[in-house]
């Protein structure tokens, strides 16, 4: 009788990113993560009680497959920061950096880089690979869901500050994901609960809102997330389900070759595409590399029904998002002078 230990098969990252319910993995979740269609896990505030628990959870997720799954989180600063206690730095809303730009552009650039570094260094010390940041939407003073998450109303300022922030992310070994292509800032409706409609023509959107994506490209911004917003003068489908937006405009016209994530397919803004299978098929058919499904019951339904061959190009793009070097643990990070300085700067801008 053979005594050889069974080895896990090497599965490439699949096209579906799922969530987990709590602070540890259940048996059902471990089974779900072994599904070949799964390529990543998104974490939320409910998955965090303290750093020790978070590190244990991310280790368990990474160990679920021989080729580790991508672990992501929405951790932008301001009101969208999933981990807030047990040593995590309170990061400013990005609008504060835009206000600083109006007074002192160089200081704003420096602080943006330091914000990106602190954000990424702390997440990576706890085993998180990617934050869905920065927000590239322009601040028109209309969208409550975007609001102070946006850097500025000027596309040039948004581009410069987001570039500086991504440099900070890169210093800690983390990639960036710009959102929400081609722009969510012009509409008041919240795509979590409604289906926003932006009536502007394509030329206006490309000139203003989409300009940061064109200027930054995939070398600076290796991932992008489209908006669950309908632009009827361009396509009847929300951008994330639109081949015109993802394949023709983003990939071909703007020459973008990074990862395209769908936004959460369980949001109300995605309901126009149909049930969960129809939503996933529409997003992948439009050119997305990975779809987010942030409800376990719908994730299981999708994994049971979805039949798709993940393109080799998508697999390679997703692999490029994984960190390229090991991160220092939390205690080592706390003793790093660069980190200490960057953290003090964030505290100053948060406290005003």
From Swiss-Prot:
It is found in: Cytoplasm. GO terms for biological process: carbohydrate metabolic process; cell division; cell wall organization; peptidoglycan biosynthetic process; peptidoglycan turnover; regulation of cell shape. Gene3D superfamilies: Glycoside hydrolase, family 3, N-terminal domain (3.20.20.300). Pathway: Cell wall biogenesis; peptidoglycan recycling. One of its GO terms (cellular component) is cytoplasm. Its EC number is 3.2.1.52. Substrate binds at residues 74, 82, 149, 179-180. The record marks 190 as: Important for catalytic activity. It catalyses: Hydrolysis of terminal non-reducing N-acetyl-D-hexosamine residues in N-acetyl-beta-D-hexosaminides. One of its GO terms (molecular function) is beta-N-acetylhexosaminidase activity. The active site is at residues 192, 263. It holds the Pfam family Glyco_hydro_3. Keywords: Cell cycle, Cell division, Cell shape, Cell wall biogenesis/degradation, Cytoplasm, Glycosidase, Hydrolase, Peptidoglycan synthesis. InterPro entries: Beta_hexosaminidase_bac, Glyco_hydro_3_AS, Glyco_hydro_3_N, Glyco_hydro_3_N_sf, Glycoside_hydrolase_SF, NagZ_Beta-hexosaminidase. NCBIfam families: PRK05337.1. Plays a role in peptidoglycan recycling by cleaving the terminal beta-1,4-linked N-acetylglucosamine (GlcNAc) from peptide-linked peptidoglycan fragments, giving rise to free GlcNAc, anhydro-N-acetylmuramic acid and anhydro-N-acetylmuramic acid-linked peptides. Belongs to the glycosyl hydrolase 3 family. NagZ subfamily. This is Beta-hexosaminidase. It comes from Bordetella pertussis (strain Tohama I / ATCC BAA-589 / NCTC 13251). The lineage of its organism: Bacteria, Pseudomonadati, Pseudomonadota, Betaproteobacteria, Burkholderiales.
